[in-house]
């Protein structure tokens, strides 16, 4: 409906909303970006990959559920995506499930408490580059001072310097589990991949973190990072949910989460 467009009409005045030249169920293109959706099958699992090419002044952004920062503020990925006119969105780090871990969104420092010294975060800088940091090595304020636009605190890093970064210690426990996954990666300074793999469904067994990292390497990313998975894992594109979100392993339904990463 037209009722919601009033809230976001301000975005059009920035000159970033452009008329799409391509807009289908698997492809989108306008003056600033092109996005294509492909589905792969690996390890008996469907993996949905959105390849983003930046052509103009578009950038990866984040949005909070209900435009509000808080521990108990959640909404479905698709709901938050629609509220910011996202073409492509994935669930973020679900910062609200934890009371520590750096949170920087669209350049705003929202949480500076460190989860622990070894916590690996993804930093997306103003120039579009990705970095992986450990919270023990740098403060959230220093990251913002260094040009961080987004800091996502989940992990682990999947690929660093083009190599698989998931080590054997990650393989104990959560890394071995096969479940839905969400990840983001950078190929070069204008090309990114948003990745969501299914799991716990009849069609998809699910990936371990090692398998996910190996798949990201196949996509030729230089840096890739694991975001919140399981029932949170959702990919939204051009008005539709692309994957099969599983709230409890049975229902195909979206989980409400704290935040999204989008264009």
Where are these regions (language model features)?
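Conserved, well-ordered active-site substructure
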Residues: 99-116, 124, 169-186, 191-222, ...
């Amino acid at each position: 409906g037209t009722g919601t467009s009033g809230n976001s009409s301000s975005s059009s005045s920035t000159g970033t909303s452009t008329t799409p030249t391509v807009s289908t169920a698997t492809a989108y293109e306008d003056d600033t970006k092109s996005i294509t959706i492909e589905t792969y099958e690996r390890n008996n699992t469907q993996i949905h990959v959105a390849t983003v090419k930046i052509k103009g002044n578009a950038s990866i952004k984040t949005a909070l559920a209900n435009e509000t920062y808080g521990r108990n503020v959640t909404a479905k990925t698709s709901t938050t995506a629609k509220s910011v006119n996202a073409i492509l969105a994935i669930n973020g780090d679900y910062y609200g499930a934890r009371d520590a871990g750096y949170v920087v969104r669209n350049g705003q420092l929202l949480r500076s408490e460190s989860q622990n010294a070894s916590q690996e975060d993804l930093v997306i800088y103003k120039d579009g580059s990705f970095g992986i940091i450990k919270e023990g090595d740098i403060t959230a304020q220093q990251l913002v001072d260094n040009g961080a636009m987004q800091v996502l605190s989940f992990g682990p890093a999947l690929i660093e310097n083009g190599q698989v970064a998931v080590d054997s210690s990650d393989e104990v426990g959560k890394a071995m589990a096969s479940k839905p996954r969400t990840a983001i990666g950078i190929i070069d300074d204008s090309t990114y991949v948003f990745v969501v793999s299914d799991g716990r469904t009849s069609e998809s067994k699910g990936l371990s973190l090692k398998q996910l990292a190996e798949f990201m390497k196949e996509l030729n990313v230089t840096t890739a990072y694991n975001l919140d998975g399981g029932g949170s894992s959702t990919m939204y594109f051009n008005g539709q949910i692309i994957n099969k979100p599983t709230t409890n392993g049975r229902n195909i339904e979206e989980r409400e989460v704290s935040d999204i990463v989008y264009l």
